[in-house]
UniProtKB/Swiss-Prot annotation:
Single GO cellular component term: cytoplasm
Residues annotated to bind 3-phosphoshikimate: K23, S24, R28, S169, Q171, D315, K342
Reaction equation(s) it catalyzes: 3-phosphoshikimate + phosphoenolpyruvate = 5-O-(1-carboxyvinyl)-3-phosphoshikimate + phosphate
Gene: aroA
UniProt protein name: 3-phosphoshikimate 1-carboxyvinyltransferase
Species this protein is from: Streptococcus pyogenes serotype M3 (strain ATCC BAA-595 / MGAS315)
Pathway: Metabolic intermediate biosynthesis; chorismate biosynthesis; chorismate from D-erythrose 4-phosphate and phosphoenolpyruvate: step 6/7
UniProt similarity note: Belongs to the EPSP synthase family.
């Protein structure tokens, strides 16, 4: 088996980085642009494999999408402009694509089959199947957990529902709201904890109307959307890897440019500041929710991460776990059982990977207990097909002074950050 040899024993990281476009916003720009009336132009779109799966799905649904002058141009014909696909819709590794597009297709008068890769086929879809069934959609997957492939028969006469989310999930909320845009009457979604709100913000940006009152979102349908020009900010989930690298590698100083700082996504910034991180925000644009972040090596202390903070940093928890291995004292992550049904069981995989390198982490049912600081050593590792595990391991390897770190299945990183290793080499000044 050929494994990638990762860079180890790095000196201080120096330089400026522009992280790729935000994955969540990129997906939603394509999805809403595909059903808005008119020509939507998207700048700064992430060209990772997940977003490409969303683009291909809409091409298969009859939407004209092409690249012009570094922009993605989407010729939307409204909700009535989608046509039955001639083939199965393949969502690759993308849970966002499958869940949100299932919600959107709920109101269409045709049937589709949606499949995914091996990893996506192990992710439960019951969380969207049940609310969509209540709205009048025929939808089913495999076993009680409704694993992909999904078979869906849309319904032009969707029923509005009031639905209390049993879990904190922006994807489930989004699937219901996308269906609700096509249902006649008032749909309400009540969240357990407030999750990322890109769908709500972007529905409004495309001319849709909804009311957000704390954890309750109300949308009266049906509605039509109007094409927009969208600029996608840098992805804070991708920036998180450089943020942590800058904090834990002695002598480092990095400037992360144009990072999206939507308040439902900035949990990691609050956590690292509480742990003692030295970070400075430059060129903050509160209206556009973007900033540049200057980060320098810092001495950190352990902390507790739980409750309403978890949905605001769920994707950053693997790299936060690495950060905690270098902090003084104990860090406890709780209420994060959702990590077990991501691209991998991230609680177990993070624990096993970092412990194999010398960390002191105990996995719990809903999180991890991490004792630091610990010295990290070489090991044979894998992404397990999970992009965030791969990038976490590559940053961990930079700290290794003894031994080599080899990484299997590194191609998974293409999902969200195709230029990750190129950027890493640029910041490593030998």
């Amino acid at each position: 088996m050929k494994r990638m040899k990762l860079r180890t024993n790095a000196g201080p990281l120096q330089g400026t980085i522009q992280v790729p476009g935000d994955k969540s916003i990129s997906h939603r720009a394509v999805i809403l642009g595909a059903v808005a009336k008119g020509e939507t132009r998207v700048k700064g779109l992430l060209k990772g494999e997940d977003v490409l799966s969303t683009i291909q799905a809409f091409r298969n649904l009859g939407v004209r999408i092409e690249e012009k002058d570094d922009q993605l141009v989407i010729e939307g014909q409204g909700f009535q402009g989608l046509t039955a696909p001639c083939q199965t819709l393949n969502m690759g590794n993308s849970g966002t694509s499958m869940r949100l597009i299932a919600g959107l297709l709920a109101g269409q008068p045709f049937s589709v089959k949606m499949i995914g890769d091996e990893s996506l086929s192990k992710r439960p879809m019951d969380r969207i199947v049940y609310p969509l069934k209540q709205m009048g959609v025929e939808i089913s997957g495999e076993t009680d957990r409704q694993f992909p492939p999904l078979q869906l028969q849309g319904n032009r006469n969707l029923q509005p529902i009031t639905y209390t989310l049993p879990i904190s999930s922006a994807q489930v909320k989004s699937a219901i709201l996308l269906a609700a845009l096509q249902a006649k009457g008032t749909t309400q979604v009540v969240e357990k904890e407030i999750t990322r709100n890109h769908t709500e913000e972007m529905i409004q940006q495309f001319g849709g109307r909804l009311i957000v009152d704390g954890k309750r979102i109300t949308l009266v349908g049906p509605q039509q959307l109007t094409a927009q020009e969208i600029t996608v900010p840098g992805d804070i989930s991708s920036a998180a890897f450089w943020l942590v690298a800058g904090l834990i590698i002695p002598g480092s100083e990095l400037l992360l440019k144009n990072v999206g700082v939507n308040p439902t996504r900035t949990g990691i910034l609050e956590v690292v500041e509480k742990m003692g991180a030295q970070i400075v925000y430059e060129d903050m644009n509160k209206k556009e929710q973007v900033t540049s972040i200057r980060v320098v090596y810092s001495r950190l202390k352990g902390t507790i991460i739980s409750g309403g903070l978890i949905p605001r940093l769920i994707d950053e928890l693997p790299i936060i776990a690495l950060l905690a291995t270098q902090a003084q004292g104990t860090t406890c992550i709780k209420d994060a059982q959702e990590l077990r049904v991501k691209e991998t069981d991230r609680i177990q995989v993070v624990t096993d990977t970092l412990n194999s390198m010398g960390a002191n982490i105990k996995a719990t049912a809903d999180g991890m207990i991490i004792k630091g600081p610990t010295v990290l050593y070489g090991a044979n590792t894998s992404t397990y097909g999970d992009h965030r595990i791969g990038m976490m391991t590559a940053i961990a390897a930079l700290l290794v002074k003894q031994g080599q770190v080899h990484l299997d299945k590194e191609e998974a990183i293409m999902t969200s950050y195709p230029t990750f290793f190129k950027d890493l080499e640029r910041l490593c000044h030998d």
